[in-house]
């Protein structure tokens, strides 16, 4: 017997809210992401990359990047324990699962292994404007080739993929550098400790934001910002500071070859720097053979990515489009993707160095950037044709009409609410329907249908009513024989 105190609280109503950092997506966003992925996937497959999908969860020790606490490894990731008391975590990118997959299946994989993947990833980080805890990522990698030409193909594929996704030539660029050049520079500049090297690279990474003078201060004793906060510098002395600044400014408007010449003069005498220079030269040669011009991909010595991750070439995709938000304010998207060579990731599993290189971008971020530039991915929304309902007794006729349209490949629906004519028209408009189909008793008896062209109404509302030829071509409402329904609707949709 249940007491009153044990009765469930039927008055409780949970608040309808999404968790912080997670967003619902409606058709517009999903259509945009699908269009981008279809376009990019077609490019990647032309390059001989095969699709791969791995599970949302990996064992936490396989991820490796976020493991501060062996008792509860959930810093940066969403983790849980399974029934075997093993920690699992939602993947935070698509590269770590690839490394696990490659190590697990290495003996049976074709080598080099070329794959691309896309899907949701999760980050247990503080959310903010435009920063979500779940987002769609697209990733392409070659595992098992140490050739710089493998890096070049990834870069070329990224260039073509972004163009196919809706960024015409001149609206985005791939910037290329090499960690070995940076390491050689650090040695030549006398940066001895790991902390000092990290401070130098972090200073270089701020070149776009602080300019040469600001970076000079951070390379030296430090910098006092506008708020009065002091950032301790790397502690380099005069000549070493000049050497670093000469390197990061070695980029040339004369193209990749001219930049390589400039870099060679700065890093001369460094064995690791010379190795990085040779790799960049081979990347440049391969890109030229692949038809990738200097305005599509260029060498930028100031690019610093993945300070403890990348081992060779690094690259970053930067958006050059002028973008605005919904209020018309200018918005800077900056980097929209990046990648590079990471020869140590698979070795975590095998103990053997396995060369790898790849590129990834955030699909949702790219869709937002395209939209901010006035380029709607996937095209404008187009809802279904809506069949208006007048009388329950005629439901068979309504479904016959909607079936006729669907059989012809036209998206259509019967209105299944209980509202009258005016609310039904408003519903069709909110759905983005190109047209509505009406069958009253008179039309049914006469074997006709009435079609109202909602696209025509929308265009008229935008001030296009003076276009007499257009109005004659697409009358706002017409009654036609029922056997002409499909052709008439197709004419409206094809407009």
UniProtKB/Swiss-Prot annotation:
Reaction(s) catalysed by this chain's protein: tRNA(His) + L-histidine + ATP = L-histidyl-tRNA(His) + AMP + diphosphate + H(+)
Claim: Repeat is one of the keywords in the record: no
Protein name, as recorded: Histidine--tRNA ligase
EC number of the protein: 6.1.1.21
GO MF annotation terms: ATP binding; histidine-tRNA ligase activity
UniProt biased composition (Basic and acidic residues): 12-24
Keyword tRNA processing part of the UniProt annotation: no
Alphabetic keyword roster: Aminoacyl-tRNA synthetase, ATP-binding, Cytoplasm, Ligase, Nucleotide-binding, Protein biosynthesis
Residue ranges, annotated region (Disordered): 1-24
Taxonomic lineage: Bacteria, Pseudomonadati, Pseudomonadota, Alphaproteobacteria, Caulobacterales
A GO BP annotation: histidyl-tRNA aminoacylation
PROSITE patterns membership: AA_TRNA_LIGASE_II (PS50862)
One GO location term (cellular component): cytoplasm
Pfam families: HGTP_anticodon (PF03129), tRNA-synt_His (PF13393)
Complex formation: Homodimer.
Organism superkingdom: Bacteria
